[in-house]
Amino acid sequence: MTDTEKFPPEKNLPAGYVPPKVWTWEPGNGGAFASINRPVAGATHVKDLPVGKHPLQLYSQGTPNGVKVTIMLEELLAAGHSDAEYDAWLIRIGDGNQFGSGFVEVNPNSKIPALMDHRPKDGGKPLRVFESGSILVYLAEKFGAFLPTEARARTEALNWLFWQMGSAPFLGGGFGHFYAYAPIKIEYAINRYAMEVKRQMDVLNRHLAENEYMAGSTYTIADMAIWPWYGRLALKDAYGDAGDFLSVDEYEHVQRWTKQVGERTGVKRGFMVNRTSGDPSSQLLERHDASDFETKTQDKFGGDPAAKA
């Protein structure tokens, strides 16, 4: 049976669509994200990155992956690690800032978050760190915090960190895209990814029924990685009405953990940094000093998303 017989073109979306022998890129590919997706890597324009006064320079936006790192940095500061002071520069991914030459030098994959450590432990030249999971591990090891040193506990924390790294694309790029962002609603795609996300939520719920935090009784980078993705979903603060669609209230242990983690000062502050949507009082477009949380949130500038960025 040929593919045409197996998958009649008239039943495809759009009707009559048949994949070509060789795919070619068109600028409109990607729907709502067409302006930030392309099939090649590298810089599109020359632009240096700003550098502030602190050794740690973060270039990011308040997406779930970006929030992981700002939560970690704020948790380190709350725990007394004063050397974790940082500058957080806003990279507007919708405007293509991540394709500037300076950003590509820090992360050749052109994705946020990206970190430059101008005071690495080896005393050498500034060190780039990219991929959110890598940044979390790097900071945990640099400051000796939020990642257990005992082998079994460390392994469990890393198990769940990498669970998040592997699972979240199904939540965001899969379910979130087809449920909230795709130009048309495709029943097959939504059903496929809704099933997977509910399975993931059940994995978390069963685990958290027996554990206070992801790695047991201790709060770690695993919690920081998972909360911005699955905690926000549990709070019905992701992908429109997806929380109701997925019946997230039924995951009682995820709900308990979500609220417990969300009450932490480091989480509250980290959630605000580089945030460009939501209540203006929760948006701190850039963070260069601890006092910025009191003086530079967007409500202080009339809620203008372009102000002070």
Which positions does each model-derived feature cover?
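GST-like domain detector, emphasizing the conserved glutathione-binding G-site
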Residues: 1-191, 195-198, 296-309
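Short, mixed-charge aromatic SLiMs
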Residues: 97, 160-164, 250-266
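Cytochrome P450 catalytic-domain "roof"
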Residues: 206-214
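Residue-level signal for nonpolar/aromatic packing positions in well-ordered secondary structure
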Residues: 115, 135, 204, 223, ...
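Alpha-helical packing segments of well-folded alpha/beta enzyme cores
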Residues: 65, 69, 193-207, 229, ...
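Active-site rim elements
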Residues: 124, 187-194, 212-213, 241-248
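GST superfamily/GST-like fold recognition
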Residues: 171-176, 214-243, 247-256, 260-261, ...
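Acidic/histidine-enriched, glycine/proline-rich intrinsically disordered or flexible terminal extensions
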Residues: 275-309
